[in-house]
Amino acid sequence: MRKKNVLLIVVDQWRADFVPHVLRADGKIDFLKTPNLDRLCREGVTFRNHVTTCVPCGPARASLLTGLYLMNHRAVQNTVPLDQRHLNLGKALRGVGYDPALIGYTTTVPDPRTTSPNDPRFRVLGDLMDGFHPVGAFEPNMEGYFGWVAQNGFDLPEHRPDIWLPEGEDAVAGATDRPSRIPKEFSDSTFFTERALTYLKGRDGKPFFLHLGYYRPHPPFVASAPYHAMYRPEDMPAPIRAANPDIEAAQHPLMKFYVDSIRRGSFFQGAEGSGATLDEAELRQMRATYCGLITEVDDCLGRVFSYLDETGQWDDTLIIFTSDHGEQLGDHHLLGKIGYNDPSFRIPLVIKDAGENARAGAIESGFTESIDVMPTILDWLGGKIPHACDGLSLLPFLSEGRPQDWRTELHYEYDFRDVYYSEPQSFLGLGMNDCSLCVIQDERYKYVHFAALPPLFFDLRHDPNEFTNLADDPAYAALVRDYAQKALSWRLKHADRTLTHYRSGPEGLSERSH
């Protein structure tokens, strides 16, 4: 029997429209070079309509690794615990005989009922999800990475994140064309790659599952040489945004909060000022740096792919490439992953099956969601997909194409209650449990339903960039009602069903599949 390996690559904050394979297929300007991702696209299937079902990092990774919508796993924001009862991918893989290795992070806060309130994991943004075997952790506080840098003889600054200040500078106003202080040999992308190669060499050809995480192109937006100068700002696509931040802010109260509150310091180490006031030249420079960080990750992936080639494991390995969420990059005068706009939620997904790929090079337009990754991996390994899982296996797409009964809409959610570094709830004067939205989006329309704020409705055919809210337009009233009904039906259909397939009866306990 052929051995089965799984390499799950999870990058951070890489948005879907920065995938050259798709750009070329659409006849768009190829402004980014990713030869190793290109290879994966040529040998696998690229999913062009793929979304994370929630943002930011902690909730997104909870959905990716449990196969559950936000409304079911309820780790609704960074800093919010994940209930221990949920079966995650790591635990499920142990059930099929794998010791799932993890490089990177999952930004998971533990269930407080399972440990002491004094547990140090409650003093950080997140830690590692139970079930995985860490072989190159980035959390908590990036200590493993900083220790590796110091061990290699690099003098760390007193404030360790200042390694991401530009070379020769103690502060930066915003986007910069200067290289990072840290050379590429000691970058975090190199750190993760070295950990991956060490792990794979230690396996010595035995079957493996490896979650290979990368921190980039997540901010701070500064790249090591030569990646800092690899792309010209003038070659970058311009941000898609209204003429000024006030126009964007007028669309919705939640949009106003983010336009008014996003700070440059969250994206450029040591910077001050409003993120919404970056001009086009600064945003193009930021995008050039973002592309440099992407190409650095791609070069690192090339080292991992070469090792799999050299050891004869490439054709034995299912490789999945995806991101936790996207990045606004100045679109709508926003930075980060927030709210309801497409750039925050649309992410890459590429799957290369082991051996021959019947649809090699295909670009699939079916609607897929981050919750589909966990059941796909379990299905490929012959494991049982948990009944509670909201996602669906994508294996049919690799051989035959889109199933006839596949979903016809995309679904994603966002919870904007206060956390220690952002307070939209207080700004909006809402209760904690009123701070949620869900999105139903198909090829034509996008509906955003809020628990306690006005809805949004966009006609994507005529307004693909979501500038005009039609929710209050009488001509669209019937459609708005229809999509509100779709949202309600979706939530009813996907209510927690962990035990709903079991039945008791005269013959004892039975289990139904449908």
From Swiss-Prot:
S-adenosyl-L-methionine keyword on record: no
Keyword Hydrolase: yes
Post-translational modification: The conversion to 3-oxoalanine (also known as C-formylglycine, FGly), of a serine or cysteine residue in prokaryotes and of a cysteine residue in eukaryotes, is critical for catalytic activity.
Residues given in the record as Mn(2+) binding sites: 12, 57, 324-325
Active-site feature positions: 57 (nucleophile)
GO cellular component labels: cytoplasm
Assembly mode: Homotetramer.
Protein's recorded name: Multifunctional alkaline phosphatase superfamily protein pRL90232
